[in-house]
Swiss-Prot record:
Disulfide bonds: none annotated. This is Coronin-2A. One of its GO terms (biological process) is intracellular signal transduction. Residues 485-524 form a coiled coil. The gene is CORO2A. One of its GO terms (molecular function) is actin filament binding. It comes from the Eukaryota. PROSITE patterns: WD_REPEATS_1 (PS00678), WD_REPEATS_2 (PS50082), WD_REPEATS_REGION (PS50294). It comes from Homo sapiens (Human).
Amino acid sequence: MSWHPQYRSSKFRHVFGKPASKENCYDSVPITRSVHDNHFCAVNPHFIAVVTECAGGGAFLVIPLHQTGKLDPHYPKVCGHRGNVLDVKWNPFDDFEIASCSEDATIKIWSIPKQLLTRNLTAYRKELVGHARRVGLVEWHPTAANILFSAGYDYKVMIWNLDTKESVITSPMSTISCHQDVILSMSFNTNGSLLATTCKDRKIRVIDPRAGTVLQEASYKGHRASKVLFLGNLKKLMSTGTSRWNNRQVALWDQDNLSVPLMEEDLDGSSGVLFPFYDADTSMLYVVGKGDGNIRYYEVSADKPHLSYLTEYRSYNPQKGIGVMPKRGLDVSSCEIFRFYKLITTKSLIEPISMIVPRRSESYQEDIYPPTAGAQPSLTAQEWLSGMNRDPILVSLRPGSELLRPHPLPAERPIFNSMAPASPRLLNQTEKLAAEDGWRSSSLLEEKMPRWAAEHRLEEKKTWLTNGFDVFECPPPKTENELLQMFYRQQEEIRRLRELLTQREVQAKQLELEIKNLRMGSEQL
């Protein structure tokens, strides 16, 4: 038998990492000097939040995504904690709400204004007080609105319901007290019905978060886990840590049987923590090492060998932390499937790195952009607390598309299109028709206008959007780079208009043929 590995066909074999140019990086950012093994960075389609240094307490910066270049040394901070900020996470269903936790044993919820900050933001929306020691991790529930999890150095995971009027919440909905040491990481499965944790006692636990009971526990001594991650709907866990020989290692587990890992792979002898990231849409796993500049990526499958190494992005600049852009914020026109924001403390720099699938065609690539989780919750807080589970509501990343799997929600939470920008120009009757046209056949607007007119207005609305961006709301370009970006957007818009014109011509020819057939049929009668 040949020693060469069996050839495996994959559409992601040639994925490569593309670092942003210098003018598209964020320079002179005072990144935290904390030694905790957290990401220290959170990203959404509007903002970058990064933990920073602040005298007399903890703070973090919220930088608009488009505000690249050198940061003003007096740029306003979000400050209000009495101790260092240890973790920040954006609300997945509200791009203007963020949670932070600190060494002062509190969690704070902040509402970020849509306009640029002109002075330090000190007024928080809610404060959560319940932990006896500092809080190291916060995590939002992936499908239920206003449910937040926090893990503290008191060895407890607390579940908070933010759907209340109180500004200071002193009692969590429930507390998970099964850990014997400091909790190092938390991860949810796709619908949020299971919680996986790693702990300083070297054990991986799969927990029912509502009951607080441990369903599975791994005490395998050959792998000391530091981070754990659910792998989508594969019913598997990926953990990173060290082997008994102190080599950095990744291990794959069956979530229903944590007695022995399905596979283990040693990576190198470095000492930095490995941060795992999984993209369920492409089944790709990214492993980012703290203290080095490399990003390894793999393809995950349900069948053996489970993990297939693709390649590695290499850089000389070591990262202290890392942020990840949600899928709805990616640039689909350049076939971008993942985007990292790398914190480089040696240069006080945040460097975006885009993972690109090389394609020759400029059209939308359906095969690499399946329906993905959007920015709308599929459950209310009370529904989840009462025992309901539901998968995320899916959206298409095609510019101008609508929800693909809508669920009825209470009247106070109207359904909206998460792919469109928050612009009042688009929140009109035409947008409502576009969002409802595919799945609400009883719409009053549809009754008042013919089907072809509704389709025409829907297509017309789509042409206003370039990669989910309203071309009429663009500010005039100030630099040569912005001018080039505007030029490429206009070229993409021209191409899309040509495609639309071709479709209209085909429809017109079909109508002419139908009319001709009807006339011939009437003459024969």
